[in-house]
Amino acid sequence: MTLRFPDLNGWLAWQETLNPKAIDLGLERVRRVWGRMGPAQLPFPVITVAGTNGKGSCVAMFEAIYRAAGYRTACYTSPHLLRYTERIRCDGEEVGEQALCEAFERVDRARGHGPEQVLLTFFEFGTLAALDLFLRWSPDVAILEVGLGGRLDAVNLIDPDVALITTIGRDHMAWLGEDLDAIALEKAGVMRPGRTAVIGSRVPPPALRARAVEIGAEVAQLGLEFDVHRVPDGWHWQAGGSAPLAMPSPALRGPFQLDNAAAVLMAVSVLAPRLPVSVNAMRQGLHRAHLAGRFQVFPGAPTLILDVAHNGQAAQALAETLRAFPCPGRRHAVLGVLRDKAVGEILEPLLPLFSTWDLGQSDDARALPVADLHAAVMAAIGAGVDPACVRAHASIAAALAAARARAGVGDCVVVFGSFTTVEVALRASADGTGVTP
């Protein structure tokens, strides 16, 4: 096969210039191209995961559980941290660059020629390539993570057998709406009539369940159709009138991960007639699931913690997890955010937890200028603070180095605010893996 570009970097750089709009929500373009590439529906079970926070964690748990049960998995997630190939995985392994380039070529040819050629966005190109690869891999189950919203996201091209919607918060409001009900309706777009929609929130916006009932979807909501019960050595999962199942604490750290795990187990149980999973495989999967950048801990002096929290809801979850994490010394924040984020909502739950703030600006064109971030942090902290406690740096790498330099042996350095911020710290780590003790 002759390729437009011989390497992955060439393909990705070109895709970023293909459509003048970085985000152009809608399904018409991907439907036209996919109609020339593959069947309307994939010939294996599909789980679609939507929501504001927790999507990646849920995908990681699905993957680990189904692999523990002996099934072949295919996963599509976004964004990536270190390598684009992280987005597309088969049986836990990243797609090879050559195979991905060939998939890109097939997508490119299916776009057509001349004035009728379809101008795909960067995300749409990757989504179609992932679906093309999944057809060739023929896994037992595919897990798809929505990129933005749900209703008009390219992933919604495929009808899921089960839709899981995690928590819903205020993020991407320029595209999804200003209030939670409006955002919920966009997420609800991944639901399908006659199929199960798992809602992984105890108190979702009312519009979410109402929409499920309106279209005739089967609803399973945390706290109603299924629930979790904490016990001293773990937790119990229970659906309907069934007997409670004892489960270990998820390997992914944070009190909210129990809700994510419960929602995942509910979806697994819905698909059990087609994909039976033993209780032991569920336990193994929850114990093995790992995801970079989600309260990822690098022990040392000081301890380094990486978390991609980038909105108010995720910042609140990070604050709760930090309070439960042993840190005998002081906490030092390394922060960089994107321009479209509500900085005040990110700062509010975290301000009381940190002694110092080192601020930086990533190379991402969407990054908030560090001078603006510094002003926001100073305003949030208020008068009387020692200016030396809040310092602005030219880069995330410089901010991280400064925080590490002033941290003591028992201290914790916490890097958060965006995927690109965490990427810098992850590249600077010893082996890029981290552990969660």
Positions of PLM-derived features:
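Beta-strand->loop->alpha-helix junctions that form or flank phosphate-binding loops
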Residues: 76, 198-201, 213-230, 251-254, ...
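C-terminal helical cap/extension that packs against the catalytic core
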Residues: 198, 202-220, 231-234, 303-306, ...
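N-terminal leader/targeting and accessory segments in enzymes
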Residues: 1-53, 57-72, 81-83, 196-198, ...
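Acidic, Mg2+-coordinating active-site environments of NTP-dependent enzymes
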Residues: 114, 118, 140-145, 160-248, ...
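ATP-dependent carboxylate-amine ligase catalytic core
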Residues: 7, 21-23, 27, 31-35, ...
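Active-site-proximal loop/hinge segments that shape catalytic or ion-binding/gating pockets
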Residues: 418
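Nucleotide phosphate-binding/pyrophosphate-handling subdomain across enzymes
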Residues: 45, 141-146, 153-164, 168-170, ...
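Short Gly/Thr/Asp-enriched flexible loops that form oxyanion-binding sites at enzyme active sites
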Residues: 62, 151-161, 426-429
